[in-house]
């Protein structure tokens, strides 16, 4: 059965053989921007939604969607966008004060933009530029956490197509608002033995995860994840030959973090496929996606 909360969280219940119930989540919201104001010359000034790496937006195509359903295309640009004109085109800082959205409409002033129906508070969507390579890589913005959502959907597909009844009952959540800090905060953890958030795994610096692995997070900036549950996930990887790494993320929080902050009394863990260049032009590998799916199936008791 499936229900959707007033906040927008989708909850799916999966019947299992036993009485023990576990939770899974992935978030469907992602990064973007919002119209903050319109300049006298018709340029859209914006505020970011979530922690996108702003310099990577310079030159990116986007769409502005109005509240009455209209969509307009545009481009994120520096306020010094032309090498033939501006001395500081290379050095000018890329931030909200020094960037804008150029609309693909004949606008010369703020009134021209308003006549299109564009208002403060309208969302701005960034082009994902999604590609699947012959070598198995997936290149796209917002694999955080579209990859995690796809992995949970694949678990549902496998259970249905293979007619598998998992050992454990499962409550699966697709959350929103994770990128702004409160995605899973309203989830009722009553009756859950444990809870695993499926999000991107970090790649880079001294971390041992690659894009082909599933990353099991031991700790992030919100604190350590449940020691016993994390160890159990590692044991599943060892038992089933799943390529994995255990990592400590220096800058991160998850749906489990939001649940704990809200007072949920449940053991929580965090896993996900290795994703390179997070919150920028991200990349993972299908091997990492498949390893994550295998670990999820093992966790709910659906992998031989």
Q: Which residue stretches match the model-derived regions?
A:
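N-terminal hydrophobic/helix-forming segments and targeting peptides
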Residues: 1-304
């Amino acid at each position: 059965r499936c229900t959707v909360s007033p906040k927008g969280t989708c909850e799916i219940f999966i019947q299992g053989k036993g009485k023990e119930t576990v939770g899974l989540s992935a978030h469907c919201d992602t990064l973007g921007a919002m119209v903050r104001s319109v300049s006298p010359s018709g340029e859209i000034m914006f505020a970011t939604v979530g922690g996108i790496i702003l310099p990577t937006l310079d030159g990116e195509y986007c769409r502005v969607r109005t509240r009455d359903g209209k969509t307009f295309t545009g481009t994120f640009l520096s306020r010094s966008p032309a090498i033939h004109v501006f001395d500081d085109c290379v050095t000018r800082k890329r931030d909200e004060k020094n960037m804008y959205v150029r609309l693909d409409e004949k606008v010369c002033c703020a009134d021209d933009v308003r006549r299109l129906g564009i208002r403060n508070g309208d969302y701005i969507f960034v082009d994902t530029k999604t590609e699947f390579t012959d070598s198995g890589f997936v290149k796209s913005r917002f694999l955080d956490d579209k990859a995690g959502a796809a992995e949970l959907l694949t678990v549902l597909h496998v259970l249905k197509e293979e007619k598998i009844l998992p050992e454990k009952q499962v409550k699966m959540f697709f959350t929103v608002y994770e990128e702004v800090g409160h995605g899973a905060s309203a989830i009722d953890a009553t009756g859950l033995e444990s809870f695993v958030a499926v999000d991107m795994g970090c790649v880079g610096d001294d971390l041992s995860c690659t894009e082909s692995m599933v990353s099991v997070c031991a700790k992030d900036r919100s604190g350590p994840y449940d020691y016993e549950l994390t160890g159990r996930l590692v044991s599943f990887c060892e038992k089933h030959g799943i390529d994995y790494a255990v990592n400590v993320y220096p800058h991160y929080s998850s749906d489990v973090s939001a649940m704990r902050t809200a007072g949920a009394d449940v053991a929580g863990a965090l896993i996900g496929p290795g994703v390179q260049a997070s919150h920028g032009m991200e990349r993972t590998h299908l091997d990492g996606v498949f390893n994550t799916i295998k670990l999820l199936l093992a966790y709910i008791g659906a992998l031989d």
